[in-house]
Design a protein with these regions (language model features):
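A short glycine-rich, hydrophobically flanked beta-strand micro-motif that places a catalytic Asp/Glu
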Residues: 90-102, 145
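Short, surface-exposed charged micro-motifs
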Residues: 32-34, 95-99, 184
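Short, basic and Ser/Thr-rich N-terminal targeting/leader segments
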Residues: 16, 27-31, 89-94, 150
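Short acidic-glycine loop/turn motifs at beta-strand connectors
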Residues: 37-42, 100-104, 158-160, 199
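Alpha-helix N-cap recognition
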Residues: 1-7, 200
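ATP-dependent carboxylate/phosphate-activation module, predominantly the ATP-grasp catalytic core
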Residues: 24-83, 87, 111-135, 145-146
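Peripheral (often C-terminal) accessory segments that flank ATP-dependent C-N-forming ligase machineries
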Residues: 131-220
């Protein structure tokens, strides 16, 4: 994050021949809407709370999600996301990222692909985003699914250069994106994703914390 003209000049001096885009930082809560589209219409599947790393050079890096996201602006987000997705010409699943300001949701970007929230969306609604994707590409959109529970996921990152000795597949289904035993990770590299579910957001996050504690015993 560049805070003044001096910092921008210093940053530009590091990459003198590389063009860059300067964007204003929007303060608020990071969120997203998962949609599926058929090229001219779209359906919102889920509203997600996004978890960011929060410090250092990776402060704005994605590190997990909670689905569903119960927020007073959820309805506005859904309406905007469906309009954007329908107008994009995309077919299949796509995500629209938001930052929720004090009074309004700000659209940040459109991701025309399977999103990082796919795990929590599928766990929360009991649906298959892949099947929704296939059907949408054939022209058929689903009804908006009912949320069956809350789902939370967090990515664990290496706190130093390390080699993972453990076979984490034994911890499934609370882990995903499972690396091979013996994989080398540089500091700050993503190692594995950990999930938790519950009847409420608080319960899902509590389960996630317990599962992370269990997984950390094998990640050292």
């Amino acid at each position: 994050v560049i805070r003044d003209a001096g910092e921008e000049k210093q940053w530009a001096s590091l990459y003198p021949d590389v063009p860059y885009i300067r964007q204003q930082v929007v303060e608020g809560i990071p969120a997203s809407v998962c949609c599926v589209a058929n090229g001219h219409a779209a359906r919102a599947i889920a509203v997600n709370e996004q978890l960011l790393r929060g410090d250092g050079e990776s402060a704005f890096g994605f590190c997990g999600s909670v689905t569903p996201f119960d927020h007073p602006m959820a309805g506005q987000m859904i309406a905007l996301a469906e309009k954007i997705a329908a107008s994009s010409g995309c077919m299949g699943t796509l995500g629209i990222d938001f930052v929720l300001g004090r009074d309004t949701p700000y659209v940040i970007e459109v991701n025309p692909r399977f999103q990082g929230t796919v795990d929590t969306v599928e766990m929360a609604c009991g649906c298959s985003l892949f099947q929704y994707h296939v059907n949408a590409c054939a022209g058929t959109l689903p009804e908006a699914p009912d949320m069956q529970e809350y789902a939370a996921r967090r990515i664990l990152f290496a706190d130093r250069d390390m080699t993972l000795a453990a076979d984490l597949k034994e911890l499934a289904p609370i882990v995903s994106d499972i690396p091979w035993p013996g994989t080398f990770f540089e500091k700050e590299q993503a190692i594995v994703s950990v999930s938790g579910t519950g009847a409420t957001r608080k319960e899902a996050l509590s389960t996630l914390d317990k599962n992370i504690s269990s997984v950390r015993q094998y990640v050292h």
